[in-house]
Amino acid sequence: MAITRIGGATAITGTIPQGNIANASLGAVTALPAAIATGSVLQVVQAITTTAVTHVSDGGQVDTGLTASITPSATSSKVLVLISQNNKLERGSAALLNYELRLFRDSTEVEYWDSVCAVEVQNDGSFYGSNHAYHYQDSPSSTSSITYKTTGKIVSSGGGRTVRFQDGSAPSTMTLMEIAG
């Protein structure tokens, strides 16, 4: 449909054909129509890190280096957090290696996965490497910027255990999806 000008230069009605809209101008949209249904994906943010972090047993919680930020457009929005956390495990001379992963929204812990990896690996210095997938739906009730991050901790007792996050520049990813509430 062509654009129709009614009442001078200030009142315009009609539909702009899709081919006439530059993708770059879509980023300038600041308001959403009231008719967006709940459950609609409003925005997606992804962060990737390849920075290696080494954690040894009895070292407490360690920041894995995986972090992402999002600014929800409404306080009723949910944030779906999708994580692919890379790690390599070495149990040393111990029989078992167990570690936990925690998810923080800013400084608040919002999720905790216990014994996310319980493995028996050789004690000859070899490693067991993998990516683990996690998900969490958050209700932050905020329109301010929110930062999510993961931390890890070896929970098996005794020394000689090591967890290496993003070892050898292997990527870990965090995807944040704002869902209309």
Place the predicted regions along the sequence by residue.
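Solvent-exposed, flexible loop/coil residues
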Residues: 16, 20, 25, 57-60, ...
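Terminal beta-strand-rich extracellular "head" domains
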Residues: 54-56, 71-181
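Glycine-rich, low-complexity segments
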Residues: 1-52, 181
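Extended, low-complexity regulatory regions
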Residues: 66-68
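Short, solvent-exposed loop/turn segments enriched in Ser/Thr/Gly
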Residues: 62-64
